[in-house]
């Protein structure tokens, strides 16, 4: 690897290709063995991934005409091509625009139109979508189709853009603050926003995650959250893709995830709380799980309850720890906490109404908890220790801006003499030992008509302790807190009995005792990306109609 490309995120792949060329970078289920029916897995080595992405980078540049800095909308399904295309674009210095199709068609098309990509790399279904909704894709001038059908949609095919005869591609000489990608937020707490990722930000995030988790090159990962897989490859891990719908993790079959874990003898599993719930349910039905190679589980998308930590430990033993890094699309990782710390005491405080402990901030991030306000601010003066405020962060893992959204930047970003701060939109506090506690989204706080504010996450931890409650959500209706319960399928109490029990439980907490109304909702609406964040605005609107 030349020094010229040393800041390029793709240089991490180049390093592993040089150090461990024949090691497996990617694996995914292929055909079944014709004789014994055993599932075969296709693999791609680090050398092959590096060389194939070099070959594609040449073709994208010379045959498709893509240039450094150009925005490229990327609609490629999980598989080898996803990684080849992504790495080729980074090497070229182009800017892949990644929009989660799980956010729904209307939101997806709005995001495409807002970012005006000049090129589209997509599977046939994505190309067809761009033709049907041509106004949203009006900026697209160049196309490459992955998977056949290029003649139908125009442009070139994936195979036609591979130029292996050209040899190594001269990786773009980018600065740490050069744009690498635009990743969209899930849209679960408002309109989806395009988050600028720089090459330095990507590289910093990968290295911090590797250090925090103790990841070593040569370990094996089964990711159920596709964006994380690019980090795993960059850290030198073998990534085995499970046979799941990555856009709908709640539909993931535990057998499919476990099959990938067993085949890979995986050290690491990455998934949303929805995936973990499916695996735990499967394990409890069978009286346990045998995962002797597994060292760690990483969860993203929403806090998980102490009960999930406890249930997983019962199934797999104490040697495997679930870690929950705290952060967001705009800033990750900021802190991390594991099962052992939660089960040693932090979880009990959650159950008593303290909120969710997300661990101590890492050294590379500055965290300030500032007074809660909804409009722009000009300073980040902290509230006293222990007081709830808005979590605000600054560091090399924090995105510098939302793309083409000046009004959102004016609210979310605060420029000071120290540098640019990002307001997370989360509320929380720092305890006496320096740990950060999450108390919910700022926009979900409940302002009471008699005065005062309730932070739902604190109360929900209390109500979630009841054995008949699958999940609880506290929302505001006309200035009153309303408890909404997703009951478990098998309940020991009738619903009227459960209401009385929960109201008695509420009397044990000064904030919770303000709850006087309990409603039932059989299956909570959740965000489309992780299928884990509760859609509180939808529940609040429903509760208002149910009066």
Give the location of each predicted region.
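Conserved AMP-binding/adenylate-forming
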Residues: 297, 304, 310-325, 329-428, ...
């Amino acid at each position: 690897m030349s020094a010229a490309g040393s800041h390029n995120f793709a240089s991490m792949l180049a390093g592993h290709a040089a150090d461990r060329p024949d090691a497996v970078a990617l694996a995914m289920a292929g055909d079944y063995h014709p004789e014994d029916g055993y599932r075969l897995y296709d693999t791609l080595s680090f050398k092959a991934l590096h060389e194939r992405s070099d070959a594609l980078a040449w073709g994208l540049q010379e045959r498709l005409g893509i240039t450094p800095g150009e925005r490229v909308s990327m609609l490629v399904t999980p598989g080898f091509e996803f990684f080849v295309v992504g790495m080729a674009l980074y090497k070229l210095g182009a800017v892949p625009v990644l929009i989660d199709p799980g956010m729904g068609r209307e939101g997806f098309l709005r995001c495409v139109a807002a970012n005006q990509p000049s090129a589209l790399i997509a599977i046939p279904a994505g190309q067809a979508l761009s033709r049907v909704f041509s106004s949203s894709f009006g900026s697209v001038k160049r196309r490459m189709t992955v998977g056949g059908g290029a003649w139908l949609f125009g442009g070139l095919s994936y195979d036609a853009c591979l130029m292996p005869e050209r040899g190594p591609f001269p990786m773009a000489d980018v600065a740490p603050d050069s744009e690498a990608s635009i990743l969209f937020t899930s849209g679960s707490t408002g309109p989806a926003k395009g988050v600028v990722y720089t090459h330095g930000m990507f590289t910093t995030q990968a290295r911090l995650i590797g250090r925090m988790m103790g990841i070593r090159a040569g370990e094996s990962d089964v990711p159920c959250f596709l964006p994380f897989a690019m980090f795993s490859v960059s850290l030198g891990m073998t990534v085995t893709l499970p046979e799941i719908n990555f856009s709908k993790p709640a539909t993931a079959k535990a057998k499919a995830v476990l099959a990938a874990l067993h085949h890979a003898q995986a050290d690491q599993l990455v998934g949303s709380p929805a995936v973990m719930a499916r695996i735990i349910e499967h394990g409890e039905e069978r009286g346990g799980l045998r995962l002797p190679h597994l060292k760690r589980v990483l969860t993203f998308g929403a806090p998980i309850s102490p009960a999930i930590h406890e249930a997983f430990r019962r199934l797999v033993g104490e040697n495997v720890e679930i870690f929950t890094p705290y952060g967001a699309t705009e800033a990750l990782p900021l802190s991390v906490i594991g099962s052992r710390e939660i089960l040693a005491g932090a979880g009990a405080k959650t159950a008593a109404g303290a909120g969710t402990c997300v661990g101590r901030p890492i050294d590379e991030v500055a965290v300030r908890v500032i007074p809660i306000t909804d409009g722009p601010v000009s300073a980040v003066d902290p509230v006293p220790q222990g007081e709830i405020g808005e979590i605000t962060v600054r560091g090399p893992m924090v995105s510098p801006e939302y793309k083409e959204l000046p009004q959102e930047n004016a609210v979310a970003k605060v420029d000071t003499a120290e540098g640019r701060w990002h307001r997370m939109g989360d509320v929380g506090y720092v305890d006496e030992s320096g740990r950060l506690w999450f108390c919910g989204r700022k926009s979900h706080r409940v302002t009471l008509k008699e005065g005062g504010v309730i932070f739902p996450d604190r109360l929900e931890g209390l109500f979630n302790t009841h054995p008949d409650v699958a999940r609880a959500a506290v929302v505001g209706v006309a200035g009153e807190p309303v408890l909404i319960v997703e009951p478990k399928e098998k309940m020991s109490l009738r619903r009227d009995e459960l209401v009385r029990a929960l109201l008695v439980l509420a009397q044990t907490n000064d904030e919770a005792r303000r709850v006087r109304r309990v409603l039932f909702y059989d299956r909570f609406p959740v965000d489309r990306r992780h299928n884990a964040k509760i859609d509180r605005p939808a529940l609040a609107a429903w509760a208002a109609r149910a009066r």
